[in-house]
Regions:
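Helical membrane-embedded segments and adjacent short helical loop/helix-boundary regions
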Residues: 6-18, 55-57, 103-123, 207-211
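Hydrophobic, small-residue-rich membrane helices and short re-entrant helix-turn-helix hairpins
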Residues: 5-6, 162-173, 193-200, 209, ...
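Hydrophobic, membrane-embedded alpha-helices of multi-pass small-molecule transporters
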Residues: 6-7, 14, 141-152, 164-167, ...
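Transmembrane helix-boundary motif of multi-pass solute transporters/channels
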Residues: 10-73
């Protein structure tokens, strides 16, 4: 496998395509603290790299985020869901259930789940363009948004076909430049605002489980436990010997417990980032 600086930098940006829009939605629509969210996410990325010793994705939970944004759920509900998902994944790992169930997930099942996650993101993105939340005060027209989306998808498909891996770097740079030119944001001075430990009130755990955890767990296990393990071994061979469904579930479970209690967002190891 030939490595280049361009390839490494481009690969390092892979998760941003999922991380940035979903994080922005949870912060703007649901009121999560952006500092806590980004700090915890960064720590989980570093931890995943140290544990698995290969490039390993860390992303927000897609179905959970889509449902939370659509229903404008409060931060306490989202954090409660993160705790519950963390506990479920830990139980699956420590009891051996994660390994046993992985035998039932054949490649067609894994690919179908990955397709479903991708389709969910497409539908959510189109809804945000056609009917943006009221908090998006400077939203472009739906026609402009759909045109930009179609253009971007076309460019990405051509780049993937031609193997222009530098495209992710270009897209990020262009996005930053366009944002600075269009919005002309103001910059404040630096400040230190560390996350604080907190537990959501017990009254929200039932709501979180029904609305967010039940729809998310099958996708998380299929795509971000079994799917990412299968893809890691396919892409990295022997270098992925640390990756297994049980270990991925363990790391993801612990990560969600930490994230939920320190103001972060529910996370997973979605295979799309790998």
């Amino acid at each position: 496998m030939t490595r280049t600086i361009t390839g490494d930098v481009s690969g390092a940006l892979a998760d941003l395509g999922i991380l940035v829009p979903l994080t922005a939605a949870l912060v703007v629509v649901n009121g999560l603290d952006v500092g806590s969210v980004l700090l915890i996410a960064g720590l989980l990325v570093v931890t995943a790299g140290l544990v698995f010793r290969i490039p390993f994705p860390v992303q927000p939970l897609k179905a959970l985020t889509a449902l939370a944004v659509a229903q404008h759920l409060a931060p306490d509900v989202i954090h409660a869901a993160g705790l519950e998902i963390g506990v479920v994944l830990l139980v699956m790992s420590l009891t051996g259930l994660a390994t046993w169930l992985s035998k039932l997930f054949t490649k067609p099942v894994i690919r179908a789940l990955q397709f479903g996650v991708g389709w969910l993101l497409v539908v959510t993105a189109v809804k945000l363009v056609l009917k943006p939340p009221a908090v998006f005060v400077h939203s472009p027209s739906s026609r402009t948004g759909l045109l930009l989306a179609a253009l971007t998808v076309g460019v990405v498909m051509i780049a993937a076909w031609r193997r222009w891996y530098v495209l992710s770097i270009v897209l990020v740079v262009v996005g930053v430049i366009v944002t600075l030119l269009v919005e002309q944001p103001s910059f404040g001075g630096p400040s230190i605002d560390l996350p604080t430990f907190s537990i959501p009130p017990w009254s929200v755990f039932g709501t979180a489980f029904v609305l967010l955890v039940i729809p998310q767990i099958p996708l998380t296990y299929g795509n971000a436990v079994v799917g990412v393990s299968d893809l890691a071994h396919q892409q990295f061979g022997e270098r992925a010997d640390r990756v297994s469904p049980s270990r991925v579930a363990l790391v993801c479970g612990l990560g969600n417990l930490v994230s939920a209690t320190f103001g972060g967002m529910p996370m997973c190891h979605g295979s799309s980032g790998l």
